[in-house]
């Protein structure tokens, strides 16, 4: 019997999922993306060579692994083709291994224009989107007016729907946001050109996943962003437009929850966040700057500097509950090397002095103060360490304390960016 293993982020994204997916796909026949779009940025380092993927599953760098894009992913044809071309220039065979669900919604030029116009209009109150059209594309999907990958192959039907959509969206762009209209013919011509390239890659991904499952194959489900950016369970409204938590797997791939065997929660050894929104443990001092510098905390999609702070056990407990996490992968432990002391947030204090758990919306974070537990740091380097026993005693104590605070085992520890710089205590596919 094969196993279905999920890899998802437990914080605000950028936890290091790409490396771990790449590591574990050694055992997988297929890797599937089930939500998000090219707002994701998964960085992989193999033998010192860095590759950043935005839409294509991270398993593409493993020879022979099938890569699938499920119906829950919003697909920008231009971004996808750029990514395919870049990989093919490196000698990676993509088209014969990548398959895309015909039910995946399309991101087109008017979605990008709307996304950017809205952020511009919000000014200081902006949400901090990547400006890549993700939100507007999901809006069209939910409103049942969106175009999907499968529509590309029916020119007349596509053109009729596109005309209606542009009438609707251009009205907003021109009259409300005072931005230029999107041209119908140019958009149609571009889409039809992409259709020819995408047609050989279209496949009923849900049916393929169940065929693989029945054949006893191991399958990896690759999440994008992080649990606290979930549209329902995140720090609303400073969230993304998809379900980044485990519930999104079934809706975004068509594989029911009973078929999921193990859910691995990727967790950074400290906390980061990109863009606006609450961040109780954020550091504005030299320590925060040190974490950012050592951890190279700049977004792989936008290049934006990430906000850095201490490890927050409160938000991780919430993520473990919401996702039914089987085990944790702790990443970037080496970034903490050399710190004299390390703080862990164990709770929040409100104006009444009470320690409370993680709120369910952004406004409820206002006025909360983190309650810290201080632990000794370590001077030794953990970079590239391959066994638990080799880690400094203080680092092992830090890991153990996190397990105690969140009630879940740490099964994998990442000690560097390369796939080989990893300690595997319990293998998800075992």
Swiss-Prot record:
It is found in: Cytoplasm. It is an enzyme of class 6 (ligase). InterPro entries: Adenylosuccin_syn_GTP-bd (IPR018220), Adenylosuccin_syn_Lys_AS (IPR033128), Adenylosuccinate_synth_dom1 (IPR042109), Adenylosuccinate_synth_dom2 (IPR042110), Adenylosuccinate_synth_dom3 (IPR042111), Adenylosuccinate_synthetase (IPR001114), P-loop_NTPase (IPR027417). The keyword Methyltransferase does not apply. The active site is at residues 14, 42. One of its GO terms (molecular function) is GTP binding. It comes from the Bacteria. Keywords: Cytoplasm, GTP-binding, Ligase, Magnesium, Metal-binding, Nucleotide-binding, Purine biosynthesis. Belongs to the adenylosuccinate synthetase family. This is Adenylosuccinate synthetase. The lineage of its organism: Bacteria, Pseudomonadati, Pseudomonadota, Gammaproteobacteria, Pseudomonadales. The gene is purA.
């Amino acid at each position: 019997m094969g196993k279905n293993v999920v890899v998802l982020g437990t914080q605000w994204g950028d936890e290091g999922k790409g490396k771990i997916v790449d590591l574990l796909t050694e055992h997988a026949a297929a890797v599937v993306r089930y939500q998000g779009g090219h707002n994701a940025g998964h960085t992989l380092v193999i033998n010192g060579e860095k590759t950043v993927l935005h839409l294509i599953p991270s398993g593409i760098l493993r020879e022979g692994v099938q890569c699938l894009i499920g119906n829950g992913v919003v697909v920008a044809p231009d971004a996808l083709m750029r990514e395919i071309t870049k990989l093919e220039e490196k000698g990676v065979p993509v088209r014969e291994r990548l398959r895309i669900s015909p039910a995946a919604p399309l991101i087109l030029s008017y979605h990008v224009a709307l996304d950017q116009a809205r952020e511009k209009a919000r000014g200081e109150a902006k949400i901090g989107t990547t400006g890549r059209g993700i939100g507007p594309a999901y809006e069209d999907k939910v409103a049942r007016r969106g175009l999907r990958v499968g529509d590309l192959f029916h020119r007349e039907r596509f053109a009729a729907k596109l005309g209606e959509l542009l009438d609707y969206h251009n009205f907003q762009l021109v009259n409300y946001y005072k931005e230029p209209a999107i041209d119908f013919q140019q958009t149609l011509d571009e889409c039809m050109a992409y259709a020819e390239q995408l047609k050989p890659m279209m496949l009923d991904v849900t049916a393929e996943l169940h065929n693989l499952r029945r054949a006893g194959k191991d399958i990896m489900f690759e999440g994008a962003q992080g649990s606290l950016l979930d549209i329902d369970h995140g720090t609303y409204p400073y969230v993304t437009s998809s379900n980044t938590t485990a519930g999104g797997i079934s809706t975004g791939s068509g594989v029911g929850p009973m078929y999921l065997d193990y859910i691995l929660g990727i967790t950074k050894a400290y906390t980061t966040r990109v863009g606006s929104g609450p961040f109780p443990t954020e550091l504005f001092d030299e320590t925060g700057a040190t974490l950012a510098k050592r951890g190279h905390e700049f977004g792989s999609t936008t290049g934006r500097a990430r906000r850095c702070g201490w490890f927050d056990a409160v938000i991780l407990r919430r993520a473990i509950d919401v996702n039914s996490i089987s085990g944790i992968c702790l990443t970037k432990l080496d970034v903490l090397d050399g710190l004299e002391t390390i703080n862990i947030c164990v709770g929040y204090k409100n104006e009444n002095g009470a320690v409370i758990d993680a709120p369910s919306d952004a406004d409820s974070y206002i006025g909360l103060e983190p309650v810290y537990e201080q632990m000794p740091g370590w001077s030794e380097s953990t970079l590239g360490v391959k066994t638990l026993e080799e880690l400094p005693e203080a680092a092992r104590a830090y890991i153990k304390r996190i397990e105690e605070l969140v009630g879940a085992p740490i099964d994998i520890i990442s000690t560097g960016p390369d796939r080989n710089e990893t300690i595997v205590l319990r293998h998800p596919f075992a």
